[in-house]
């Protein structure tokens, strides 16, 4: 399968949430989420294995490798850009990965409107856009409001991991996560290597340019 084999699902006024070719499409600037009946996760995947989720999946190298290596885990790749979704979809099919589904849409919208409480075992956020300029920081993925949704969808003792090359972004994300979650790493709550993490296109890119990579890991408290 080539990336271009995945066709755009809607045009103009036909925009609506739908599942097609193992991809859940959530249109941008769309507000009729209640009109879509989300299938159960067992229906979505065809089994009841535990669910893991990657945000900012990019070209899909990391999540396809993880799904291939862990067939008893169900994986969700969330990526808002359709050109990248096509690449993930192509790699998924060419690798014959059966335990991966793709969400083409905003992570915040997907979490808020399409995921029930306490269903995700682990969330991995790989190299989100740092939006470094002060006037653009409102666009950052890590916000206090989104953290409430993260806590809601994680199971008790569920984990969230962030990988980034931007230390300022890292420190802001740690500050936000500390409000609702427990750090798994000792202070300063981040490390520069995480064992058995795998790698991604962005990680290889930034390391090739001599940039440091930072990882932080937090866990949901039981009963919150």
UniProtKB/Swiss-Prot annotation:
Coiled coil: none annotated. Keywords: Methyltransferase, S-adenosyl-L-methionine, Transferase, tRNA processing. Its EC number is 2.1.1.33. Pfam families: Methyltransf_4. PANTHER family: 3-DEOXY-D-MANNO-OCTULOSONIC-ACID TRANSFERASE/TRNA GUANINE-N 7 - -METHYLTRANSFERASE, PENTACOTRIPEPTIDE-REPEAT REGION OF PRORP DOMAIN-CONTAINING PROTEIN. Catalyzes the formation of N(7)-methylguanine at position 46 (m7G46) in tRNA. This is tRNA (guanine-N(7)-)-methyltransferase. It comes from Chlamydia abortus (strain DSM 27085 / S26/3). The lineage of its organism: Bacteria, Pseudomonadati, Chlamydiota, Chlamydiia, Chlamydiales.
